Amino acid sequence: MGAPILASAAHAVPALETGGHAMDASITSRETKGGRRLWYRMRVIQQPERARACGSGPKSSADRRPVDPPPVVELRIYEGQTWDQAQEKDITFVYNANFFLFATLEHARIMAHARGSASSANTPPVLTGMPVSGMAYLDRPEEAGYFLFPDLSVRHEGRYKLTFNLYEETKEDKDKDKERDVESQPPLTGLSPATGGSFDFRMEVKSQDFIVYSAKKFPGLAESTALSRVVAEQGCRVRIRRDVRMRRRDGKGAGDYDNGEEEYNRRRRTATPDNRNNDFAARARSMSGSTERTPYSADPQRRPSMADYPSQYAQNPPAGGHLQFLGGNASSQYPAAPPQPFAQPPSVPASPVYPPTQAAPYQMQTSYPPPPPPPAPKRERTPSQSGYAPINPAPRRESIHHDYRPSGPIQLPPLPPPPYYPPTPQQSHMPPPQPPQVLPPLQIDSNSKSNNRLPMPSPTALANSAPRPLASLAPLAPLMQSTSSSAGKGPVHPATLPPPAVYAGAKRAHDESFWSEPEHGRYQNGTRDKGRSEDIITDPTSMPFRRADGTEADGIRLRY
């Protein structure tokens, strides 16, 4: 086997195409048994530039991080006694032989180690993939033989270079080596012993240094080169990337291993915006959302209205607005009083505050609207629009009470208090009749029906909400009695009422705040009224009621 002959003046081989890194070539020659001299010229026409370390884990053997771009080695064979003569006769395509190229990996710089420590220089870096390539005869870019390495991966990061070793299997005896030196390398045993073939080492060529990056520092794969495309178009298996896949990251690149020589000029350095501060701000806002919802919870809206009851009953309620929404009959039971000095919180100014003994009928009407026509519930729910002042409203509405105070009789003669006042919504009296201008629409009937479940008049009878003469409105007095929850036959003097502050700070049951069912009856003068549910339908007689002067009279019964 002929020893490799490098380009030198002794062999009349000039320095050929050594200007560029892709044109560096290694040339050798040998003499065959037939007396011919063959010249081998091999060069790396596509140098590797970068790679990503594929690691050394259990699955690293299946991890493919190919060197980019894939190395391409060109081989040409010439025949001639001298190099000048050989360049005129290229026999690459006509020479009958098999060639393969074996790639090995080595460090670009020699690593120094401390004394006494095991030298790891003898441990070669791990190269995975397909390090062997057969020669492909291609017409482009030039007619020559090409070795492609599209599947070479490196496990560890660092700076490396590839060494390509050329082996030849001769097919004809005349092309074998003329004489073999004893000190020369023996031929490799062929893969097919039956044929007696063998592989002879011809030459080697080294690539330029390239960098293997870690996964964190890898700049990404570049677009496939024109040479890779040309080779792939001719049937070779080379991966083609038509889009740039370079990473946009800010960090160190080739400066880690190039010793300050050159940088990878295609790497793009673009700082990625840091969004960690935005995440912290978003979490802070989400955490503060619970505190923002606290002032709008249900408890702060209900508690101030309940706490207003004790201060409202510190003085007598105003006479003009206590029960005017019930028809004005009960509005004359209390003498006029100065406005309340308390200040109601702003969370409940929209809904007027009612005393516990009298607010039940009004709240019952708003919670359970009765079937009468729309005008009655509308005026009932908005007493300020129907011409009647609300019961104990906020201080800003107290002027309304005094404005409507002259609309009906104000003073009542003081009467003896009833013997018993249970702490229930029945603490009221039978309201005396009032002049027509202060009687409310017939929403009182709807309230009594919703509380006592009595049949109500037809909508045509209740449609007229204008004030009526006293004779026509007299039968409504018993209905007022049912809604006002009287505890005695006569009006109750305000001085004798127990302080209703006991209901201000606690929740009450529905039966304590609203009308009890008809089967339970009502207390009047210490006895339970049994005949209230039949007043309208079953009782054919006249309807007695008590006037303001204390006398009883029979009213005209409504027929429907």
From Swiss-Prot:
Biased composition range(s): Basic and acidic residues: 171-183, 395-405, 508-535, 546-560
UniProt motif (Nuclear localization signal) ranges: 49-54
Highest rank taxon of the organism: Eukaryota
Biased composition (Polar residues): 444-453
InterPro entries attached to this UniProt entry: Velvet (IPR021740), Velvet_dom (IPR037525), Velvet_dom_sf (IPR038491)
Disordered as annotated region, ranges: 49-70, 171-197, 250-560
Key word Transcription present: yes
Amino acid composition bias (Pro residues), ranges on this chain: 336-355, 411-439
Keywords: Cytoplasm, Nucleus, Sporulation, Transcription, Transcription regulation
Record note on quaternary structure: Component of the heterotrimeric velvet complex composed of laeA, veA and velB; VeA acting as a bridging protein between laeA and velB.
Name of the protein: Developmental and secondary metabolism regulator veA
Gene: veA
